[in-house]
Structure formats: C-alpha cells, structure tokens
Curated annotation (Swiss-Prot):
Disulfide bonds: none annotated. This is Glycosyltransferase 8 domain-containing protein 1. Keywords: Glycoprotein, Glycosyltransferase, Membrane, Signal-anchor, Transferase, Transmembrane, Transmembrane helix. Pfam families: Glyco_transf_8.
Length: 365
C-alpha cells in the first residue's frame, strides 16, 4: 500500500471517529435538554435578570437562600414590596424565585429592573391544574392558579435542598436567614406555624368557625376523610409561610400526594364549606397531618387582613414581629387595612404606573 493510500485511510478513519464523537455528544445534549424540560415542568425558568445589569451594587455572596413567591398581575406590587422588605432587613444572599403568568413577565421584569433584587422569573402553566380543581363556575371565581405554585416547589427549584415559601401579602422585619435556619425534624418535609400558637391565636377571626382546627377546612362527614383517621380538633397550620426540605419532599413524592387529594376533592367535594375559597390549605393539612415541624410563631404573625386586626395587636407587638401576614380580606395595599403604614415603608412604586396602593388621603384630594 502506497503512502498516499495510507494517508487517505487514516483521514477517513479520523473523519469517522469525529462523526461518532459528534453523534454521541448530540445524544447527550438531547438527553440533557429533555431532563431540563422535565425538571422545570409545570413552568419554565427565565434567566437571572439583575445579575447582568451594569452599575448595580455588588451582589451578595455566601450560601444562597432560595425564596419562592408568587406574583399575579393584579398583585405584582405586593410581591415586590414583600421581597424588598426581605432584602433590606438582611445581608443574606437571597435569591427570589418569582412565579407568575406569562402575561405578567414584561411588567414584572420592568419593575424589578429598578431594584437590586437577585431573582429568577418562573412562568406557571395553569394547564397543570386541569382535573385538579372544581369546575363549578362559582368556585372557579375564587381560585387563583398561582396559589398552587407552592405544590411544585422542587420543580421550580431543582438544585435547592432547602427553601422558603412566602405568600405575597407579607412584610418581613427580621433577618430571613433566621427563618431559613429553622431546624426540621428527621423525616419532616416542612415547618409551619400552627394556628393554635400564642401569636396567631390572638388574631383568630370571630365568626369564621373553627379556623384553627382541621374541621374548619375538611368535611369530616365524607367517607374519604373519615378513613384517614384524623382528629377533627387537631390544630391546623398556615401554609402561607413555610420552610421546606426539598430533598425530603422529592423522596416522599409530596407533589403527587397533594395532586391526589386535589383530584379527589374535584370529584367528591371533600373540603369544608366554612372556608370554600381556601383551596390550598386542605390538601396540605392532609399530607402533613402530624408530620411537620414548627417555625417560631413570630415568623408568621397573621390575620392582619381580618376585620378589627388593629384592635387585636398592639403597636409594640407588631413592631417586634419578624414577619407580618395580612391573610384575610383586607390587604395592606387596599383602602381599609390595619398597619398599612408598615407596608408603605417597603413599597417600590411601579415604573409603569399600572399598580398603586389605594389610600384614603389620596382619594379625598
């Protein structure tokens, strides 16, 4: 064989080897992309917004503290204000994972571009809820799709081992690192604040039934609930603020358990009629029945959105609270809420002018 033929053979072999390597790499890339897609269902994660903006303050270093919060269009101001209160009261490296709907991405991005908040925007796909919530028109009016985002925390935070979930109607006055460091017992997925604790019991709403026990959320006359063997007078907990061990969450298939009870309720109407508009608490009460840890009650001082909340809490107590929660009808960006001056302290005006808090003195001008 001549030298020329040998060179040709070697060249052909090199080309074949290159094509084999290229083919394998393409297969690996395809597998990677498929895995990424499955990890982020039912939403997609958009890239960091503030990390790449020039002229910003130096980003905080150290252990990341993931915080998941939702931001529906009509309440974007609530989410931004809550996040700002967290950022300003801590030096921790907090990453805000904001779940919103597709139509709110531009508005939210514009607003956040005026802040120093380190964040990711996650677009939630409401179709994931098909068959999991009642189709009754009257009930559907009170259902907000984003309220179920907390059920999918591991999908939105695939790399996090531990994270915090917060409702948007909160203000944080303490260092969020303290809440993040809440100790969870072995085998426990999450830590909540119970409704019977000394702080929240001051704000129990009169006339709202048994709002601090399981019977206020579940219909114990239904056979499916009876079979669970739960005690109706068991103290309930508030799922608007919690710390989650996401590794344990995935191992125990918590999302699947929550979806199971959502589907059962859609077919059998298992939730209590007392709080018909509360769709997220009942399945969580079932899944975490006597199997959760507790957070410090001062990290969820709630019922500030209830009638007469201003008479239930002293100014000194509210000032000492680590986290204020306006769960209830009256929100701090509305006209008749208690302690709205505290919320105003952390409010960042909407650069688009679409959102603004309602205030009496403004209306009277």
């Amino acid at each position: 064989m001549t030298v020329r033929r040998v060179n040709v053979v070697i060249l052909v072999l090199l080309v074949v080897a290159f094509l084999i390597v290229l083919h394998r790499n393409l297969l690996n890339l395809n597998d990677f992309l498929n895995q990424e897609t499955s990890d982020t269902v039912p939403g997609m994660i958009l890239p960091f917004e503030t990390d790449f903006l020039l002229g910003r303050k130096a980003m905080r270093s150290g252990e990341e503290i993931p915080v998941l919060i939702t931001a529906p269009e009509e309440r974007l101001g609530a989410a931004v204000t809550a996040m700002n209160s967290i950022y300003r009261n801590s030096k921790a490296n907090v990453v805000f994972n904001i779940v919103t709907l597709n139509e709110s991405v531009v508005h939210l991005s514009t607003w956040l571009s005026k802040t120093d908040l380190k964040h990711k925007i996650i677009v939630f796909d409401p179709s994931i809820l098909l068959g999991k919530i009642p189709t009754d028109a009257q009930k559907m009016e009170t259902v907000r799709p984003l309220t179920f985002a907390r059920f999918y925390m591991p999908a939105f935070l695939p790399d996090a081992e531990k994270a915090i979930y917060l409702d948007d109607d909160v203000i944080v006055q303490g260092d969020i690192r303290e809440l993040f460091n809440t100790s969870l017992k072995s085998g426990h997925v999450a830590a909540f604040s119970e409704d019977c604790d000394s702080a929240s019991s001051k704000g129990i709403v009169r006339g709202a039934g048994n709002q601090n026990s399981y019977i206020g959320y579940l219909d114990f006359k239904k056979e499916a609930i009876k079979k669970l063997g739960m005690r109706a007078n068991t103290c309930s907990f508030n799922p608007g603020v919690f710390v989650a061990n996401l590794t344990e969450w995935k191992q125990q298939n918590v999302t699947s358990q929550l979806e199971f009870w959502m589907e059962r309720n859609a077919k059998e109407d298992l939730y209590s009629k007392t709080l018909a508009d509360c769709m997220t608490t009942p399945p969580m009460l079932i899944v975490f029945y006597k199997h959760h840890s507790n957070i410090d009650p001062m990290w969820n001082v709630r019922h500030l959105g209830a009638t007469g909340a201003g008479n239930r809490y002293s100014a000194q107590f509210v000032k000492a609270a680590k986290l204020l929660h306006w769960n209830g009808h009256y929100k701090p960006w509305g006209r008749t809420s208690s302690f709205s001056d505290i919320w105003d302290k952390w409010y960042i005006p909407d650069p688009t002018g679409k959102f603004h808090p309602i205030r009496k003195h403004v209306e009277e001008k």
